[in-house]
Amino acid sequence: MATITASHFVSHVCGGATSGESKVGLGQLALRSQAVTHNGLRPVNKIDMLQLRTSAKKPSKNGRENEGGMAAGTIVCKQQGMNLVFVGCEVGPWCKTGGLGDVLGGLPPALAARGHRVMTVCPRYDQYKDAWDTCVVVELQVGDRIEPVRFFHSYKRGVDRVFVDHPMFLEKVWGKTGSMLYGPKAGKDYKDNQLRFSLLCQAALEAPRVLNLNSSNYFSGPYGEDVVFVANDWHTALLPCYLKTMYQSRGIYMNAKVAFCIHNIAYQGRFAFSDFSLLNLPDEYKGSFDFIDGYDKPVKGRKINWMKAGIREADRVFTVSPNYAKELVSCVSKGVELDNHIRDCGITGICNGMDTQEWNPATDKYLAVKYDITTVMQAKPLLKEALQAAVGLPVDRNIPLIGFIGRLEEQKGSDILYAAISKFISMDVQILILGTGKKKFEQQIEQLEVMYPDKARGVAKFNVPLAHMITAGADFMLIPSRFEPCGLIQLHAMRYGTPCICASTGGLVDTVKEGYTGFHMGAFNVDCETVDPEDVLKVITTVGRALAMYGTLAFTEMIKNCMSQELSWKGPAKNWETVLLSLGVAGSEPGVEGDEIAPLAKENVATP
């Protein structure tokens, strides 16, 4: 267990807050003369931390005001709502490489809007301009070293965003890590990832007990020990192990529970069995990590498997769609050799939502023409022309335009798509691909303009404005994933009235309805080593079906079906709440639905 080394600081030392800015709720907790830091946050010393209990303010009937003084909806907080702590390596918009960051960016505010107290804990990869130094320091044993760790904090959309500060995460003190969260380049991990994520898990267990947070109008003080932790993917799989060995074995966190969420079963954290000693766990936990497979990487033979341990040691296992949950237990290949363990422990699938504030065609700052379901048929031809002009395609509102947005790798089926383009490009169609990933795939899509100058474009860059323009201006969104736990591209596309042509896998089955909001190609071969000719044929055939409907009344109806759906996080948050309440943590009660407190910050960059 960590040693607390927080000292008593005056407020102006920490994060630059003035004394006038920081006198929020001074009388709520008497903490042995500790000085207030930013926004009412105070360090907690080791004498106080076991005595603190969370207090909740009475909910305001008039709603709260955001930082600009404008009313931004109502949040109804019950005194006995859950204390939820989400732990992950990505939290949008501060740091994300895929769906994990979007989930931890969007789901916590939706649960906060239901009246629960919610925290996220994530590494501090960059110097986020809206996250303040709390001046709380803890010492953690990582491998054979004792490492001091600081906590930074930001309060956004009703959620305490906590960032773990350590040189293993923030490699350049003055600069950005370039979104290289897991390794120096795609497909290559940092050698010390096990130590990095061990530190993250330990810090996440300390945060609810040592951070005295008072930014909310509804809650104050530390979260206490009656907490539900939600660990996300293999990087956080040590959390239930440390909870049991470092805390519950000493009578601490006795009511706390851990839910473990699988966002992508393909990434499991497999390492040499000899590395178990780095984790500082008792030998009795070796069985939870012990794993033998037929692969030579990272070493041949016996290994430790972090995700296996997370599944076996957590109190409940989740994943990000009902159909993906079914796939994970269906066979060895789809469960990636963990299917037996998932069947033993059980799994609950809940579809993701999406950020309907950032992705809103009626207010999208990247679109020249704003629209809703009543004006979509007038707006989309204009937006398609603007998109064609932007990428250098012949401007023609009457030619169908297919878009692809995603990582250029085997999981997303970019190799299948590339093989299929030459077969369907002779049809009356244009295609635009946007994405980054493996160099060989980036080079392939960049050659499309040379091969089909009037038909195709490939942009191997991270380009947010272009992603929004494609989502709005394309007639179809092509999603040829070999497997897709949930997927967000299809949600964004449907929100903007763009039907999807998608593989029948994972969350795509749950969210895209054949003939109603899109077209299903069928399931693809999950073997990423080769391109199955049958999969290529499925793409060609389904593209043909979609193009045959283009311009018809049925197609207009499909566009409106897409836009009429409820795709926000409200529904998923209610489903998550129901299952988390079943864990029976003391003091937990259902929330009351309200609106999110404030819009998400759109830009969080390093301070020079």
Curated annotation (Swiss-Prot):
Gene Ontology molecular function: alpha-1,4-glucan glucosyltransferase (UDP-glucose donor) activity
GO cellular component: amyloplast; chloroplast
Subcellular location: Plastid, Chloroplast; Plastid, Amyloplast
Catalysed reaction equations from the record: an NDP-alpha-D-glucose + [(1->4)-alpha-D-glucosyl](n) = [(1->4)-alpha-D-glucosyl](n+1) + a ribonucleoside 5'-diphosphate + H(+)
EC number, UniProt record: 2.4.1.242
Keyword field: Amyloplast, Chloroplast, Glycosyltransferase, Plastid, Starch biosynthesis, Transferase, Transit peptide
Pathway recorded for this protein: Glycan biosynthesis; starch biosynthesis
GO biological process terms held by the UniProt record: starch biosynthetic process
Positions with a binding annotation for ADP-alpha-D-glucose: K96
Stretch forming the transit peptide: 1-76
Pfam families the UniProt entry points to: Glyco_transf_5 (PF08323), Glycos_transf_1 (PF00534)
SUPFAM superfamilies assigned to the protein according to its UniProt record, in alphabetical order: UDP-Glycosyltransferase/glycogen phosphorylase (SSF53756)
Top enzyme class: transferase
Family that this chain belongs to: Belongs to the glycosyltransferase 1 family. Bacterial/plant glycogen synthase subfamily.
NCBIfam families: glgA (TIGR02095)
Purpose of the protein: Required for the synthesis of amylose.
The protein, known as: Granule-bound starch synthase 1, chloroplastic/amyloplastic
Organism from which the protein derives: Ipomoea batatas
Lineage of origin: Eukaryota, Viridiplantae, Streptophyta, Embryophyta, Tracheophyta
